[in-house]
Regions:
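N-terminal membrane topogenesis motif
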Residues: 1-26, 82, 86, 231-258, ...
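Signature of the first transmembrane helix
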Residues: 8-66, 103, 132, 249-271
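Alpha-helical transmembrane segments of multi-pass membrane transporters/permeases
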Residues: 14-19, 130, 141, 145-175, ...
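Interfacial/gating helices of multi-pass transporter permease domains
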Residues: 34-55, 189-194, 240-247, 270-297, ...
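Helix-loop junctions and terminal segments of transmembrane helices
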Residues: 62-77, 301-321
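Interfacial segments at transmembrane-helix termini and the short loops linking adjacent helices
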Residues: 111-128, 284, 350-379
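Membrane-interface helix-loop junctions in multi-pass transport and translocation proteins
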Residues: 152, 163-214, 399, 409-443, ...
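Membrane-proximal transmembrane or re-entrant/amphipathic helices at the cytosolic face
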Residues: 479-539
């Protein structure tokens, strides 16, 4: 039984990891033609609107899939299908109300959310109001199927969403720029950014239609379950709503505190730089460079966090049984897979920052690459803190990461203010503040993990071995890129060869220094295939 559960866990983690990776790659690839279409100023406005949208979405419905799947799973464990269905209906009511309120605030409160120096982003933000409303409904349907341990609909809907986002963002931004081609540049930039945000709406709408279709296909099975249910207690709607709110609100609060630093940093950057006399176009252009950096940095971070996060329920289960040894072992596994991905990605992005940003974002003026080289450490730090956040929440200590995040936020804001007012770092101050925030978060969470679980990070297996393998990888990738580029002067071909050679070297050296177990191979992306290759190598 335990092996079956482990297999299901790995399979669900694989679905989510692959979908997250594909979604992020699509998101990265479409940003390249989008930035070419919009230009840096309009792209900066688009990025700012998306940043504010993310915070509003977090308040409206960010934790709904998690809450729905958790409460429904508790009912389904005892075959209380009607009670589970009532949770689903009440969750829909919750997101309709909350999503509606937040969407209205987005529509009519844009002047509060966006500073004057970024006023061109207000129109784009207003365009995102309907998307906030629809996102909550989409999240509820995703949580419904996750409760049944079926991650495939969620995974496919994420890919569908990103495909529609990519197509419609590029299409509508071009349409809007053409429509307002004769207008002032500031007006044209604002409408270009607004057109790009229409892609986000199209993506959410398409994913929602997909989930509705999946639900419709399964309607007969759903009705059969409800008909044969003899275990449900037919809980009052008010009680179900109360349970949803009690689970959702702490998650929203902690997630808000954990993620709001990005919004605050952006708001402070644009506001203080405007106060210091920097012109509007320079502020938005540099913010576009920051957006390019974030687009690239989020791919390895998402990939490194998805699978470990899906393993956290196993930690909770072992902790509940007071089996601390097994719980610590699960955390070691989650940390190992996260660092196995995070560390080489961070090193590789630092070494090839210039070629990558020039390939994907031809309009970059070079700042994105410099931001990348400065900020890649956040991939490793955030990968670590994402796991510790999940563990502390999973063992019944949700207030601890929330308090730690609040402390880190205060330090972040203070550092950001000093850096912007006392130095000329400008947009680089955002990345420095992000690093400071992540370091504080990691240190505080690690202290809590030691206190409540006597846990110590597996420094050698999780951190040192990937780092040792990443050093020769970086040398090979760097020398091969610049050597090949000198011969053929093709950034694309040189970069492709360098990345492939770097991955091969990393894998071979990692096998030599680490000698991963069968269990570790099973957790790797494409682990079965990699194990076969490893068996043929003389190591």
């Amino acid at each position: 039984m335990g092996k079956k559960n482990d297999n299901t866990l790995v399979k669900n983690a694989s679905f989510l990891m692959i979908a997250a990776l594909i979604s992020k790659i699509i998101g990265m690839l479409y940003k390249s033609p989008l930035s070419n279409t919009l230009g840096n100023s309009s792209m900066g406005l688009f990025n700012y609107a998306q940043n504010v949208y993310f915070i509003l979405l977090m308040i409206a419905s960010f934790s709904i899939p998690q809450a729905v799947s958790k409460i429904m799973a508790e009912k389904l464990a005892f075959k209380r299908y009607r009670d589970a269905q009532k949770v689903f209906r009440c969750a829909l009511l919750y997101v309709i109300i909350m999503g509606g309120v937040v969407a209205l605030f987005c529509l009519f409160g844009s002047s509060i959310l966006v500073p004057e120096s970024m006023s061109g982003a207000r129109l784009a933000l207003k365009m995102l109001a309907p998307t906030i409303f629809l996102s909550g409904i989409l999240g509820t349907f995703r949580g419904y199927f996750q409760a049944y341990r079926n991650m495939l609909p969620t995974s496919l809907s994420q890919i569908v969403e990103q495909c529609f986002v990519a197509v419609f963002a590029i299409l509508m931004s071009a349409v809007m720029l053409n429509k307002f081609s004769g207008a002032e540049e500031s007006v044209r930039n604002a409408w270009g950014a607004a057109g790009a945000t229409m892609g986000t709406g199209a993506g959410v709408a398409s994913a929602l239609l997909f989930m509705l279709f999946v639900y419709w296909v399964n309607r007969k099975n759903i009705k059969k379950r409800l008909a044969r249910d003899t275990h449900s207690r037919d809980e009052a709607t008010s009680e179900v709503m109360k349970n949803i709110v009690l689970i959702v609100m702490p998650i929203i609060l902690s997630s808000f505190i954990y993620n709001v630093n990005g919004f605050i940093n952006s708001y402070m950057y644009s506001g203080i730089q405007g106060f210091k006399g920097l012109d509007h176009d320079t502020i938005t252009s540099l913010y576009a460079e920051y957006g390019y950096y974030m687009t690239l940095i989020n791919i390895p971070l998402t990939l490194a966090s998805t699978a470990p996060t899906s393993m956290i329920p196993e930690v909770s289960a072992q902790y509940a049984k007071r089996d601390m040894g097994s719980a610590r072992d699960k955390i070691d596994r989650a940390t190992w897979i996260s660092m196995f991905i995070s560390i080489p990605c961070a090193v590789g992005l630092a070494v090839l920052a210039g070629p990558i940003t020039r390939l994907l974002f031809p309009r970059t003026e070079g700042a994105a690459a410099q931001l990348m080289m400065l900020g890649v450490i956040t991939i490793i730090l955030n990968g670590n803190s994402n796991i510790s956040n999940g563990v502390l929440q999973g063992i019944g200590k949700p207030n601890i990461p929330m308090i730690n995040a609040a402390i880190a936020l205060v330090v972040d804001v203070a550092a950001m203010a000093i850096l912007l007012l006392a130095t000329d770092l400008g947009v680089y101050a955002i990345v420095v503040a992000m690093i400071i925030y992540a370091v504080v978060m990691c240190l505080l969470n690690e202290r809590a993990m030691k206190q409540y679980m006597q846990y110590k990070n597996p420094w050698r297996s999780a951190y040192l071995n990937p780092l040792l393998a990443s050093v020769p990888m970086a040398v090979v990738a760097g020398f091969s890129y610049y050597g090949i580029y000198k011969l053929i002067h093709s950034n694309f071909i040189s970069l492709g060869i360098a990345v492939v050679l770097g991955v091969i070297v990393y894998f071979i050296v990692y096998l030599a220094v680490s000698k991963p177990s069968d269990e570790q191979f099973a957790m790797m992306p494409g682990g079965a295939y990699l194990k076969k290759i490893a068996g043929k190598l003389p190591l």
